[in-house]
Amino acid sequence: MQKVVLATGNAGKVRELASLLSDFGLDIVAQTELGVDSAEETGLTFIENAILKARHAAKVTGLPAIADDSGLAVDVLGGAPGIYSARYSGEDATDQKNLQKLLETLKDVPDDQRQARFHCVLVYLRHAEDPTPLVCHGSWPGVITREPAGTGGFGYDPIFFVPSEGKTAAELTREEKSAISHRGQALKLLLDALRNG
């Protein structure tokens, strides 16, 4: 099996990708297991940051790398929190603080102007100098609610209402979410690209 470094320390992401990519002869290992520190995310887009993370992991380990960069873009806020989604409420950000800050920011915004999208970019680099990385982008439209609902998922899921499902992302089962989410879409594109060589 070809060992591939996943540019994350998130055990959940590692497990998810490892099970899906094992069929392609890829052995997914978290960068933290290989002693790789996180890359500095200096890009201004999800694509730039995913490439920075993948290139850093590939350079340090000498292995192919996969990286993910994702976040929430709210239309009325010009795409914010965007690439700053995980640290929207500041240096000591938590999911709860980020969610509360977004609800407070949108408190006077009418219901018909609360559209948002989750974005996920997955990048696969064959090596650190790969000039043609695989870049896969998934986008998931929804609406920001006024109150949290549901206990599943993480991040902004409790306030991200999915009109097609009639519930928030936090109220979806893991299987339901994976089938339609931004990350699920990006992962499907990556699997298709790997399958087709």
UniProtKB/Swiss-Prot annotation:
InterPro entries: dITP/XTP_pyrophosphatase, ITPase-like_fam, RdgB/HAM1. The active site is at residue 69. The keyword Cytoplasm does not apply. Substrate binds at residues 8-13, 70, 154-157, 177, 182-183. One of its GO terms (molecular function) is metal ion binding. Signal peptide: none annotated. Binds 1 Mg(2+) ion per subunit. Its cofactor is Mg(2+). Its EC number is 3.6.1.66. This is dITP/XTP pyrophosphatase. It comes from Escherichia coli O157:H7.
